[in-house]
Amino acid sequence: MSKDMKYLVLENYIGGKFVPCSKLIDSFDPSTGEVYCKVPDSGAEEVNAAVRAAKEAFPDWSAKSPADRSKVLNKLADLIEARLEEFVQAESKDQGKTITFARNVDIPRSAYNFRFFASSVLHHTNDCSQMDHMGCLNYTIRCPVGVAGLISPWNLPLYLLTWKIAPAVATGNTVVAKPSEMTSVTAWMMCQLLEEAGFPPGVVNIVFGTGPRAGDALVSHPDVPLISFTGSTATARLITERSAPHCKKLSLELGGKNPAIIFADADMEQCISTTVRSSFSNQGEICLCTSRIFVERSVYPEFLTRFVEATRRWKTGVPSDPSNDNGALISKEHLQKVKGYITLALAEGAQVHCGEGVDKLALPQQNIGGYFMLPTIISGVKDSSALMQEEIFGPVTCVTPFDEEEEVISRANNVRYGLSATVWSRDVGRVHRVARKLQAGLVWTNCWLVRDLNLPFGGMKHSGIGREGGKDSYHFFTEVKSVTVKH
């Protein structure tokens, strides 16, 4: 950004070049509520150009060996790590998350996504069988699909964008990606590194803009046979409808209403500290955050008291202050939506123990217009309430007692979502038993957010379609072909 410019102005990255866009969208600094960046408002014209560039690059890129592609991915990881602090500062300012979270989670994981898939693509095996009575040998081949359309969300901007780009290009596809228009800066910064990393023009194309314009043009494009999307269930329905006429491969990672089940024999100290983190990390703007907490009745009073005390020690404030645990929510509209659930809770007779409407948040004068909200704990909520049924996606969690194991499993499953769950107990038999019965794609016991990227990631029910990670990403971003050779 030049000194005479008021705003940072982003450009699309198409065919190895930065391309200005005549239409621009305001992007806000969540910590101040002020415009600080202009993002392309791309539409069909820009998406079409990106798809053409990706199609032209596909034959040569897909013909490269996995080892050659792996070297390019590792080089990009090196370049991101070399500029780690620049990416950290940009991600924090653009998204509102704390600089500590961006430094410890977002940017290191973004680089690691490239390293992980650079390695894993070298170690996949295919199937083979011999039919002696027919004199035939059968084997499978995995081939890249073509141009991959990738749409990533605003909560973990570079982290989830690279989670999609890395396996797509590692397996030989070319990419047209659309990050969220609210958090586009680190994707734009990554584009500045692609040529140096060794990506030929057109292998990775980034088109910025809104879902209704750029996103719709991408998912409905006849030359994009594959879509990977992370975001809301409502948007996923539209993507499914728009892509259906073209029979596209879809991977949809959607919302969650994730339960924590805390039995009386849980390690209470570890459980409380982890549940504070699982409920409120990144302002509660993680699809895996805990938003329903079921506590066995005999320890419910103790848990609730200690949980409220621990949550009040969780600091909310200016994202650039490394002592803060939470920063600002993504937008004014989202803040109002989340606060609306507190209004609903009070109208339904629930009790707010801490946070919104109970405690005061002191902010510097320049941040008064920012989108801040204290972590909020609510009790006395019915299972049928919107607070227990809908994804809030903010620093709000509900706590409720339970009596029996089968009862709490039934209540935990009684939502339309099925992304993740946590179970707290020292009884190994119980945690295995409960994990098997929970309708969730990921179940953590006595921990949260421990991830082996080799294992499948995704949800059940309205939390998504398909899985990604390790061999699941390899399978999604390739097509399998069976070959029979008679000898």
UniProtKB/Swiss-Prot annotation:
GO cellular component terms attached to this protein's record: cytoplasm
Pathway annotation: Amino-acid degradation; L-kynurenine degradation
Catalytic residues identified in the record: E253 (proton acceptor), C287 (nucleophile)
Localisation: Cytoplasm
Entry EC no(s): 1.2.1.32
SUPFAM superfamilies with a match to the protein in the record: ALDH-like
Enzyme superclass (EC): oxidoreductase
Alphabetical UniProt keywords: Cytoplasm, NAD, Oxidoreductase
Binding residues annotated for NAD(+), in chain numbering: G231, S232, T233, A234, T235, A236
Site entry (Transition state stabilizer), positions: N155
Name the UniProt record assigns to this protein: 2-aminomuconic semialdehyde dehydrogenase
Organism this protein belongs to: Danio rerio (Zebrafish)
Source species taxonomy: Eukaryota, Metazoa, Chordata, Craniata, Vertebrata
Encoding gene per record: aldh8a1
